[in-house]
Amino acid sequence: MNKILFIFTLFFSSGFFTFAVSADKNPGSENMTNTIGPHDRGGSSPIYNILNSYLTAYNGSHHLYDRMSFLCLSSQNTLNGACPSSDAPGTATIDGETNITLQFTEKRSLIKRELQIKGYKQFLFKNANCPSKLALNSSHFQCNREQASGATLSLYIPAGELNKLPFGGVWNAVLKLNVKRRYDTTYGTYTINITVNLTDKGNIQIWLPQFKSNARVDLNLRPTGGGTYIGRNSVDMCFYDGYSTNSSSLEIRFQDDNSKSDGKFYLKKINDDSKELVYTLSLLLAGKNLTPTNGQALNINTASLETNWNRITAVTMPEISVPVLCWPGRLQLDAKVKNPEAGQYMGNIKITFTPSSQTL
């Protein structure tokens, strides 16, 4: 594809500009990709340009491109964009913009949402300045009786529109527009692949379905003979990255409140901190067995985790209007102690979860 360079020379005294295009461009089918973001749901949602005055055709020696239009494949089906699929009747020139309803699909969950895209065209004239925004299916447009030598196309997502996406994730859409010369010639189709990388950092969390807040777990120590006591319990959890499990890596850190640096986990006797019981942790995460060390991070490449629907769970969280995907885990606590002193023992574990989406 030719590289097109616009050079504008402004003449403020006369009130118009002239322009030069370094090469003519013939219209035809094009494939384009536009990636938006990362954008966080907690922030404002500004205008995002998909195409900004994109040169679709130009020829300084003729006016064959004076009636170009850009039409959706359907006026109803939003899969590739719904907007007028035929030219406006008659010779009416429609000022303004065209609304396009486009379906976006989240990569992991396959949940779908529709967003509004706005588009307009502008014709280019060799010796006149008429930068009017025109609807994509409007008729040809003359400027001071001069016919256009080419046209540009602009597409954008309006401010606030991304707020319609209900949760973080990788949202994909494919917009297709037929490129025509009004009534008689179809030059080709523009295929525009759009990806919105949407994070939800304010909702990154470890979800504990059995508990409304912090978990309280009893190790259930019981004697097995010979002065030995064993105990076991587990806590179900789901790790939500605010990005529909699209994070490339996870860091999980388990740390208790003791001052030792031996990597072990301890329970302390209530009213007598000198008496301690050692216990161990094991984490089953999306089918992978992990052994946490006190205070040390577990660094997990998510490519090593199973990603079938048995390993990624949809859960409903109070802060989010629809079910979201998270990595399911089960934390198991085990203790085996010899001749423990009678009494109540207590400990705390702080779990820190940092997915790669946190730093996007």
Swiss-Prot record:
Superkingdom per UniProt: Bacteria
UniProt keywords, alphabetically: Fimbrium, Plasmid
Compartment(s) of residence: Fimbrium
Alphabetized InterPro entries for the sequence: CblD (IPR010888), CfaE_adhesin (IPR043037)
Primary subcellular site in the record, as a coarse category: other
GO cellular component terms given for this protein: pilus
Name listed for the protein in its UniProt record: CFA/I fimbrial subunit E
Organism: Escherichia coli
Gene: cfaE
